[in-house]
Amino acid sequence: MAKTRGSCCLVNALIAIAFLATAHLCEAGLSQKEQDKVSKLPGQNFNVSFAHYSGFVATNEQLGRALFYWLFEAVEDAKSKPLVLWLNGGPGCSSVAYGEAEEIGPFHIKADGKTLYLNQYSWNQAANILFLDAPVGVGYSYSNTSSDLKSNGDKRTAEDSLKFLLKWVERFPEYKGRDFYIVGESYAGHYIPQLSEAIVKHNQGSDKNSINLKGYMVGNGLMDDFHDRLGLFQYIWSLGFISDQTYSLLQLQCGFESFIHSSKQCNKILEIADKEIGNIDQYSVFTPACVANASQSNMLLKKRPMTSRVSEQYDPCTEKHTTVYFNLPEVQKALHVPPGLAPSKWDTCSDVVSEHWNDSPSSVLNIYHELIAAGLRIWVFSGDADAVVPVTSTRYSIDALNLRPLSAYGPWYLDGQVGGWSQQYAGLNFVTVRGAGHEVPLHRPKQALALFKAFISGTPLSTHENSISRDMSELVSDS
């Protein structure tokens, strides 16, 4: 559980001032970008061909809010490749912990919590990848104003993330005007369209300081509370995880509830459902749970992913290894986290942030309509083994958008095998990934990389669409 840092805010403020002053004095010798360059990480027993940078960008100097980032340049042709911002959700979960260390980043962590290995399916093979821990209180991101940690919400997260991007690109001016995309998962289903909307509005009022946003992609993301609940209850019932009675009660008591702020009555039914489901990994229902962790009961009530990993040797306890690694003082030093600014205990998710989340609209579907009209490339993908924001939830939400289909629904292929299913709509592309859980790149890394490459290039995944379309036409003609 992440600790609140309010008790030592004065000390942190003084450290932050000293830290920034030192950085200013070093400006004559090294730019802030050069100071942020990471030379080598503890436990990295191999060389890499790409540069990477990490550090802080202040989003509110008066209150002392600063967000932590980690940039990985593309393996090849970094100067011509697009920039992609990756966001995890929660709310309150770290993009470094999940996105970088478990999913799409190049550096993954072995079971000893000290040694790194290179992810052969890292997304920086195709783009420059920027991980951001937002809002403050998540990961290494901090505020010197203790009340900030209990006043986060969707609105301020979007505002601070936009401020971060505008200031970050001044530090890395080579990315000004570069094609820019936002990708992420889970509660980032709120963050991503909200930040995209903020960027579009900013661009409309600023010619000189615009961000060249081309599109976004959301995986297993919250989109609409009603449809997310509807699809979730249907999914866990259809797989036989809950009883008919509990299914009926969930629909009755929770069907119109907020996804992250449920009523006491709804929570009681969710507790019953959790007991019936048992100790499985609801983020990946067909893989083993981590028995080394505490009981995973009440998973439907928790915001923090208790995830599992498929790698060369299956290890469902990845979160534990990540927590050990990013608490190491030598790791924090390598990532330019001053001792006085580091959390007393770094954690993958912050309970303080999630439990005090202030604003969360019941739906972001209206933003989808706005951004489709703005001409952004929008893809939505879903791992079909996720029982937190399942594929049924996503399909209900997309159906509610009432978009015109442009292609038949059918399988896409990778190496001759079905990778999942897809359908293109006017303004949106929907893709499922077969066998993947809530964190698609974790369980199906090869398929996820193929999906990502297709998205940023704007090319469809390999399908047998023509034969499917022909079959559908024949059926319509026969009827």
Curated annotation (Swiss-Prot):
SUPFAM superfamilies for this protein: alpha/beta-Hydrolases
GO terms classed as biological process: proteolysis
PROSITE patterns registered for this protein in UniProt: CARBOXYPEPT_SER_HIS, CARBOXYPEPT_SER_SER
Claim: Glycoprotein is one of the keywords in the record: yes
Enzyme Commission designation: 3.4.16.-
Highest taxon in the source lineage: Eukaryota
Name this protein carries in UniProt: Serine carboxypeptidase-like 29
Organism ancestry: Eukaryota, Viridiplantae, Streptophyta, Embryophyta, Tracheophyta
